[in-house]
Amino acid sequence: VTSDDKQKNLELLQATAGMTANQRLVVMLYALHPTDRGGAVVETAANLAALVGMSAPVFSRTRKQVIESGWLEESDKLAHIRYYRLSPKALGVNVVVPLRRAT
């Protein structure tokens, strides 16, 4: 883990200051967990819940709250399993492309 990565994680932790402890834990889990090329955490909710010591229902409910607040977004769906990734908002990425005048 580079110094830049540590700084980004600290900034993410600071940005989640208004959230509940469980919500922050879910956001940080998605920030720190290995991802696929698209940034998705390819792991079931039950396995992720076990990693942070939550029951699966509490984890799923908390993750739903985090999704609704815009911190996570659905990345992939395989059969009935949905995979999520941090949203551009969480990563501090500006996805709005400035308009330019037509020539």
Kindly label every feature range from the protein language model.
Residues V1-L51, I81, L99-T103:
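Short recognition helix of helix-turn-helix/winged-helix DNA-binding domains
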Residues N22, H33-L91:
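Winged helix-turn-helix DNA-binding recognition segment
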Residues P88-T103:
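Conserved segment of winged-helix/HTH DNA-binding domains
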